[in-house]
């Protein structure tokens, strides 16, 4: 069998998350990290020197030199940057949420289809090792409960705290929305949502109850004002209950048996979700496969997040 071909990759945006994209790509045997681009040219030059690559002066220069690129810029720039890359025939992995609006998300999906390029979206939790076990053992979930809690981001001079350019639904909860839509695989029939701003200008804590067409109910809480971090999901099926911890990559499975309830430890091979995500993206480019989290999947999660936000602010329609 021939060796996988080397993919020429660039990273656009080398802030808190993009720096890790650059680190991981620089260590991948199947990747040539061609270069980085960031509006902060000094930052790009610093990271480029660290990883033995170059800093490009413009986005267009980077786009003309690569086959694939990661986009890790503020959400309001996702559409502009990803569009520029797609129009030059570059395969794109854009961070979540896919875009700032559903219209922008749908436009990116359309552009990628027309240009015949891969559009993957960085819902990194889909690559958490616990997800494989969850997908295998949570067929036909009946009730789902998810909690995603984080401390408020530290201040940045002259900038919003990281992530607070959007509300907590688009910042944190959207991870769980995308996973739950994937697990249930049915349309949402009803949404009931509440949320309040506490430390920022938009909702910092939110709760939503989703009712799906098949009767499954999901209750989801997200907060970025918690003193501690938590990323957990509990899934109840007809004959089992799974409690999974994304953060610690651990979990428990409880099954009904003829003697009562049997408890099992969840066998999970731990790994770095971001590295697994980038490896999957590179394989998709090599093989021209459909990504695990496509633009269409991410746009569906964004539509639901937008409806949740609308309802928090205006009430049920």
List the predicted regions and their residue ranges.
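Active-site loop of classical SDR/Rossmann-like NAD(P)-dependent oxidoreductases
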Residues: 39, 267-279, 293
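Predominantly a Rossmann-like dinucleotide-binding segment in NAD(P)-dependent oxidoreductases
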Residues: 125-194, 199
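N-terminal Rossmann-like dinucleotide-binding module
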Residues: 1-50, 180
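Contiguous beta-strand/loop segments that form the cofactor/metal-binding neighborhood of enzyme cores
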Residues: 177-250, 275-288
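Hydrophobic residues in well-ordered beta-strands that form the structural core
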Residues: 57, 94, 119-121, 145-146, ...
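C-terminal helix-rich "cap/oligomerization" subdomain common to oxidoreductases
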Residues: 1-3, 68-71, 282-317
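Beta-loop-alpha module in the N-terminal Rossmann-like domain of NAD(P)-dependent dehydrogenases
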Residues: 21, 51-109
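Rossmann-fold dehydrogenase core element
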Residues: 107-124, 140-146
């Amino acid at each position: 069998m021939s060796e996988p071909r080397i993919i020429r990759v660039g990273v656009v945006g080398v802030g808190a998350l993009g720096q890790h994209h650059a680190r991981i790509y620089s260590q991948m045997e199947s990747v040539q990290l061609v270069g980085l681009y960031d509006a902060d040219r000094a930052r790009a030059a610093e990271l480029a020197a660290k990883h033995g690559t170059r800093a490009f002066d413009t986005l267009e220069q980077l786009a003309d030199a690569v086959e694939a690129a990661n986009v890790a810029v503020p959400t309001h720039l996702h559409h502009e940057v990803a569009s520029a890359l797609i129009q030059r025939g570059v395969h794109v992995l854009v961070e979540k949420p896919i875009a700032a609006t559903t219209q922008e998300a749908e436009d990116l999906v359309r552009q990628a289809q027309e240009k015949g390029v891969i559009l993957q979206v960085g819902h990194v939790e889909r690559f958490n090792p616990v997800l494989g076990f969850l997908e295998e053992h949570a067929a036909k979930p009946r009730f789902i409960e998810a909690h995603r809690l984080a401390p408020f981001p530290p201040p940045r001079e002259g900038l919003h705290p990281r992530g607070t350019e959007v509300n907590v639904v688009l910042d944190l909860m959207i991870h769980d929305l995308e996973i739950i839509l994937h697990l249930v695989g049915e349309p949402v029939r009803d949404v009931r949502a509440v949320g309040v701003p506490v430390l920022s200008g938009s909702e910092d804590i939110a709760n939503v109850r989703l009712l799906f067409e098949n009767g499954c109910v999901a209750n989801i809480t997200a907060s970025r004002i918690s003193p501690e971090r938590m990323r957990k999901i509990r899934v109840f099926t007809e004959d089992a209950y799974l409690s999974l911890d994304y953060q610690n990559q651990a979990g428990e499975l409880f099954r009904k048996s003829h003697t009562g309830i049997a408890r099992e430890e969840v066998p999970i091979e731990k790994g770095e979700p971001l590295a697994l995500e980038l490896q999957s993206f590179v394989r998709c480019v090599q093989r021209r496969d459909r990504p695990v989290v496509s633009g269409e999947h991410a746009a569906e999660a964004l539509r639901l997040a937008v409806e949740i936000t609308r309802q928090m602010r205006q009430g049920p329609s």
